[in-house]
Swiss-Prot record:
NCBIfam families: rplX_bact. SMART domains: KOW. GO terms for cellular component: ribonucleoprotein complex; ribosome. This is Large ribosomal subunit protein uL24. GO terms for biological process: translation. Pfam families: KOW, ribosomal_L24. The lineage of its organism: Bacteria, Pseudomonadati, Thermodesulfobacteriota, Desulfobacteria, Desulfobacterales. Belongs to the universal ribosomal protein uL24 family. GO terms for molecular function: rRNA binding; structural constituent of ribosome. Keywords: Ribonucleoprotein, Ribosomal protein, RNA-binding, rRNA-binding. Part of the 50S ribosomal subunit. It comes from Desulforapulum autotrophicum (strain ATCC 43914 / DSM 3382 / VKM B-1955 / HRM2) (Desulfobacterium autotrophicum).
Amino acid sequence: MENFKLKIKKEDKVKVLTGKDKGKIGKVLKVLRKKNRAVVENINVAKIHQRPTQANPQGGIVDKPMPVDCSNLMIMCNSCIKPVRVGIKQLEDGKKVRICKSCNEQIDA
């Protein structure tokens, strides 16, 4: 696998475009660059059977969010409050920031 240049980062608010969780909005917990996937909070949740350990002596069935392909996610813009395409703009000081394609506002905090 090759590394992809992803525009989705950890802590981003994203909307799911396709699949069983279509239309849901969640926060990105983890980005898997090599697999072009992201783990999103409360999206694509699977039930995992966990055996008892010292940390969790009870064990049992646990809900765990599984990775979603990044092509099925779209970043939510904070200013226009809708899913948008993302562009990259270079500031005068040379720093690159992500911008919303529809309102040209900066997405990065």
